[in-house]
């Protein structure tokens, strides 16, 4: 059980027009910036571009990582990242989570003393943007992981793709951003966006942990590539199905086959490719 304090956290409210528990917030002014330029005809035009700001994550007194993020859910990103990297344990007693907007820092404090110097030396840069770091024992954590077999209907995939594509989002507003959606059946539940696809996954991981949501009957939908990093995080979150409109990497497919994860890519309209599961 987590015991956390959050400051300044504002969640989206479910509306009559969608079924999301948390939905994108494209209307938040601090997430985009108006920039003026010229188009191909030379005409002056103003467009919105996504903000990108650093967020440094501390665990107790130790600096862990600096991530580039849009800054909408800093506490969720920090806790989800630490959880997915194995730095926060199941049932961890988290005494406080403090976010300083001016310093762009989140400090997570636990009752347990922590020291991850050895772990930090084993980190591996991945193909992910913004953070792109996997620690060695995160991959070791996959040993013995076999995901549950779950029913999956093609109609769910078609419904999810259509619903997600028409949801108002920062991607539709400004582009240059990734989206990740936690789904159940044909219903999208939590939709997170960020400049790094793994950031969006980490935010969802934090939500699942706080709400005690089991991943065994869930589907993860992402706009990003199906890389090893994405597959590892999905597997460690206990989610047996990972879907993307984008393509695969060989290592991602190999790990998915190892843990029994259903991996579906190139999801466009009613076309897709399944390489594992």
Question: Where does each model-flagged region fall?
Answer:
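Flexible, glycine- and charge-enriched loops at secondary-structure boundaries
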Residues: 194
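Feature captures the catalytic cores and cofactor-binding loops of soluble hydro-lyases/lyases
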Residues: 197-277
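Intrinsically disordered, low-complexity regions enriched in acidic/Ser/Thr/Pro/Gln residues
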Residues: 4, 8-185, 190-191
